[in-house]
Amino acid sequence: MAKRDFYEILGVGKSASDEEIKKAYRKLAMKHHPDRNPDSKGAEDKFKEAKEAYEMLSDPQKRDAYDRYGHAGVDPNMGGGGGGGGFADAFGDIFGDIFGQAGGGRGGRGGPQVYRGADLRYNLEITLEQAAHGYDTTIRVPSWDNCETCDGSGAKPGTSPVNCTTCGGHGQVRMQQGFFSVLQTCPKCHGSGKINPSPCGTCSGAGKIKRNKTLEVKIPSGIDDGMRIRSSGNGEPGMNGGPPGDLYVEIRIKQHPMFQRDGDDLHCEIPISFAKAALGGEIEVPTLNGKASFTIPEGTQSGKTFRLRSKGIKGVRSGYAGDLFCHVIVETPVTLTERQKELMREFEQLTIEGGSKHSPQTKSWKDKVKEFFE
């Protein structure tokens, strides 16, 4: 099975502090520690899973690489020498597992273990316009591929892997646990059943090398922030003939200077002049598909919201367009000329003489103040 998200394992968000991550790990470690659950294989697996997640997220450099690229951003424990098991360690056990190595699947009875490749994650930042209209792009994803020098065998050219002398090529060894006989992943070949007496110099016997893979990604119109696009088979390669993992492209939408998105709806603030608010009239507003206009009535107050139907974003699932909500902001004039100030004073005097009919909210507020002090 594919590796789970490290943040999900610990039950914390991606913005969690170091202390929160440490606290979450301690809680899980206490709950699932093998000494407290001697007969629970599930608890033991969860304990190892939590430990691996903590080891990655507690290291600032590893956490940064994981946040950017997912599991592919964290280097496997690549080792050289005769074992050729460095790459296998990336899928393997933290402490050693007498019940069989965690994180993979078992092949034929007594044969080498087969592992599905790890899933990869790639964060892709796009604009709101690209999200609304769809977008085709290419991305470069760091991934592990078969070493071309040794064709993935891990052996030096001209040589071949040989059966592991510890497990006889089976990838597993049998251990006696009291009255029970159980299979354990071979500690020498790490489940592959093979060792390389002469490891490949390019990949140090791992059979894998890290490189950037260029992929085309089609972003559907209407996609929202946080949605993921799955690219099957473009994750890390499997082990011992296992299938490759998948690539998940997680969408991040840049903040727009004018619009705020709420699902398929859009919101924007529209500044209008004092005169336009008082007299009413037609105003022109931008949308993601061009310009639109609507009429505001006389006496429009600041904060009034106008709804333009179907001027939002067409939903990626619903197929229907959301609405555009225009929030009117009446702008108070500044840097007035003397003539403008004179006219404003005259206007203010006329408003006072006209009584509450010109400023009903002001009249209501004054009445409330008067009642408050009486």
UniProtKB/Swiss-Prot annotation:
Zn(2+) 2 binds at C164, C167, C186, C189. Zn(2+) 1 binds at C147, C150, C200, C203. One of its GO terms (biological process) is protein refolding. GO terms for molecular function: ATP binding; heat shock protein binding; unfolded protein binding; zinc ion binding. SUPFAM superfamilies: Chaperone J-domain, DnaJ/Hsp40 cysteine-rich domain, HSP40/DnaJ peptide-binding domain. The keyword ATP-binding does not apply. The keyword Cytoplasm applies. It comes from the Bacteria. Its cofactor is Zn(2+). Belongs to the DnaJ family. HAMAP family: DnaJ. Participates actively in the response to hyperosmotic and heat shock by preventing the aggregation of stress-denatured proteins and by disaggregating proteins, also in an autonomous, DnaK-independent fashion. Unfolded proteins bind initially to DnaJ; upon interaction with the DnaJ-bound protein, DnaK hydrolyzes its bound ATP, resulting in the formation of a stable complex. GrpE releases ADP from DnaK; ATP binding to DnaK triggers the release of the substrate protein, thus completing the reaction cycle. This is Chaperone protein DnaJ.
